[in-house]
Amino acid sequence: MTDVARIAQAIREAGLSGWLFYNQFHRDEISDLALGVPRAAHNSRPWAYLVPAEGEPTRIVHAIEPGILEHLPGRLVRCTSHDDLFAAIGAAAGPGARLAAQFSTSFPVCSFLDHGTAQLLERLGIALVSSEELIVDCLGTLDAEGEASHRRAALALHAVVHAAWSRIRSAAAGGAAVHEADVQEWIAGLFAEAGLVTDGPVLVAAGAASADPHYEPVDRGRQLLPGDVVQLDLWAREPGERSVFADISWVGVLAPAPTAEQARVFDAVVSAREAAAAAIGAGLADGLSGAEADRKARDLIARRGYAGGLRHRTGHSIGTRVHGYGVNLDSVEFPDHRRLREGSCFSIEPGVYLERFGMRTEVDGIVRGGRLELTGGDRQQRLLDLGGGA
């Protein structure tokens, strides 16, 4: 159920007049998620929902789709024309209103309000402010139910990755040919046994393919060969729209032990992961941002001589979408200067990608009680291998 009171509280804390949700064709996923509008609902006409800092919200709908916001509180206004729609928004906002809306110069993932509509709203005398901070408060943190589902998924993924590597090890010992798609299928089966669902094939990358952070195999993919680095990246959740994802990455070598170069790269990414986690734990009370946490990991990797192997941010928000709408650990791609806060859930996944291979280690963390807690089982401290590495 949509917590309109929580939305209003966030608006007041931001010092704004209100938050304008505006959608058509379900283009604004944030509006749908925040307000609990089902994707199956007809949305061929625009609707607006204005939550004020104080007072009653206003539901503005087209007469042909009057029920799309019926589950929400507030005064109902029905429109049949473009002029009616914007007149109703202007009347609900009031003179000199400062309204949050879904746009951002920093985060394209939050930018759903089109420029033309923004211009029309500004002609009404409305000052528009990015909703990027409000989104974190209302969609980018986990409640107790979401946290519990995330923790269960994280533990299950930990078991799955070890079961998958055990099967890889057994196949190698028996001389069986194994391709990347085989491992993907094994993991899909393990997900089903564990009662997990996901949104696509997991990442399995062998040899030079491990240097591609978002690699996708063609047909059966590459055969796993002796000496290969094998990168596994798994994400899944329990069934249900309110369930929260977990997302982990483990890496191994198809050999009894890694080469010296493989060991150096692995040590760099593990050390970067630990540096980011330590910085978050130490900096939460001072309002540490996602960008600051990212820089800790990046700086360590650069000091180890692998700055040229950096390809992506250190982590992303996690929610009911595997890439959620909370704070990201990012100082480069889309620098995130929003502070990590109570209920923030995110990955910590530094990686180094060279010409012959790449490596990434990924754990998930949640801020609870002012502390960082890493979820799931024990985090990876040594490479998986064909000897005793686990």
Question: What residues fall within each predicted segment?
Answer:
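Active-site neighborhoods and metal-handling regions in enzymes and metal-associated proteins
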Residues: M1-A390
